[in-house]
Amino acid sequence: MPKQSDQFGAKPAVLRCGRCGKFVDWEEAHVQIVCTCRPRIDMPPVLVREATDDDRRAARELFNQDFGRTKIVAFGELMDIEEMPALVAVRHSTPSGALAYRLLGDALHVVALATDPMWQRSGVAAYLLAEAELLARRLKLGRLLVATTNDNLPALYFYQRHGYRLTELIPNSVADHTHQEEAGFAGIPVRDEVRLEKRL
């Protein structure tokens, strides 16, 4: 595997084990089948809002923690998510998740979605996505588009569970931009961009 560059290293995202709560490195994570027997824990309420200047600093930290950088490849382009509008999810006055987006044509593009590992599996990402959908409806946009990578099985699961449909696979899109093949979720090589859509 080629040497990782500073700009496009392996995704440093940290996941939390749903059974024991231990933090797991992205590349070391595994997919497994589990039932819903775990008791549901009531979580503190989530407030989702447009990011303020103070929120943007926290959002940048979340994106850096999740992606290792704020410049990412999405929709076939290299994008700087720091320059995009963002929604933040706040729990106990602390940002626990962030969603960067752009408006283009009749669609809202979800460019990046990051959740603090402490709040994974607590609904933060779902609240952010629901707010993005409300924003698109208020703006009378007809659809939301999402771009992710072939290795990102958690994202593919999440978006499809929320009504998004696979619409396009762009082979080697990420590899062509990064000029390398990096290991992604569970060691799956990151190569392709996968696009999903939800019509409103």
Where are these regions (language model features)?
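Short cysteine-rich clusters marking metal-coordination/redox-active sites
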Residues: 17-20, 34-35
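Short, non-ligating residues that shape and space the ligands of small metal-coordination modules
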Residues: 26-27, 43
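Cysteine-rich micro-motifs
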Residues: 30-41
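Conserved N-terminal entry element of GNAT/NAT acetyltransferase domains
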Residues: 42-54, 194, 200
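Acetyl-CoA-dependent GNAT
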Residues: 50-119, 126-131, 170, 199
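Conserved GNAT acetyl-CoA-binding A-motif
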Residues: 136-148
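Conserved beta-strand-loop-alpha-helix junction that forms the acyl-donor binding cleft
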Residues: 146-155, 167, 171-177
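Conserved active-site tyrosine of GNAT-family acetyltransferases
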Residues: 158-159, 164
